[in-house]
Amino acid sequence: MKVILREDFINLGKEGDIVDVKDGFARNYLLPKGFAVFSNKHNIDIFSQKKRAILKRQESRRKMAVELKEKLDKVNLEFIMQSNDSGKLFHSINSSNIADELLKLGFEIERRKIDMHHGALKAFGTYNVIIKLYEGISSVITVEIKREEKKNSLKKSKSVKKEV
């Protein structure tokens, strides 16, 4: 089924592109969510009239992506995590955790733009995570997972004495 994209869609195309997708993907996802419209004569005419505005918008997005890339390339995220005695993390770091930390630093990044090519981060160490900002523009941030320092004092069980 041919559809016209109403906004940029990663791995599919840019706003205004006519793309051929599977019927189920179009009917169940793209069309109901408003990411695309049917490719018919009427919609093609509308998008051809809007082409100049679309190109201008894409150029401004590209400029913003380049500026954002320069700022993000300097970002290093550090997560202090708890682990068991053998060193296994109690929970992993995923794209949502990274997006939340970036939001705290003032960067509003959609979690679908964060490429976790390692999968979820499940061990201590330093990782490079790619953030896809725009077509052909991506940033690499460093994510470091450190062990939470355990307190030197052992937890002593306190016994309560009952007086008779």
Curated annotation (Swiss-Prot):
Entry keyword annotation includes RNA-binding: yes
UniProt-listed PROSITE patterns: RIBOSOMAL_L9
SUPFAM superfamilies given in the database record: L9 N-domain-like (SSF55658), Ribosomal protein L9 C-domain (SSF55653)
GO cellular component, one term: ribonucleoprotein complex
GO BP annotation list: translation
Alphabetically ordered keywords of this record: Ribonucleoprotein, Ribosomal protein, RNA-binding, rRNA-binding
Pfam family, one: Ribosomal_L9_C
GO molecular function: rRNA binding; structural constituent of ribosome
Function in brief: Binds to the 23S rRNA.
Matching HAMAP family: Ribosomal_bL9 (MF_00503)
Family: Belongs to the bacterial ribosomal protein bL9 family.
Protein name (record): Large ribosomal subunit protein bL9
Taxonomic source organism: Borrelia recurrentis (strain A1)
